[in-house]
Amino acid sequence: MIRVFIDPQLLIFKMSGHSEFGPVGSDIVCAAATMLASTLVHNMTTRLDESQILERELNSGHAVLKVMPIRRKMRDECRVLFAATLEGFELLAKRYPEHVIID
């Protein structure tokens, strides 16, 4: 099961586990979760200076992202992107509740 924690206010994202929905390399739930996580990490790394990325890890079965934008406007933009990612994971969890859980 994939477990996800996202706090759009604190700008923290954590994901762990495997969905075990299908065979490795053909698992659509895992692919969807990976794309959501990868898109969030990409958006943060292209918008923020390295000094504002407190933690970043994206591996098979594990992802962590913590950011602290300095400017208020950028913080607000990041919160929107974190919230959109949370919404994506909520939709995925609704469709595949045995394979994705939001903490």
Sequence positions of predicted segments:
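Short, conserved glycine- and acidic-residue-centered signature motifs
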Residues: 29, 33
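N-terminal intrinsically disordered, cationic/polar leader segments
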Residues: 1-28, 41-103
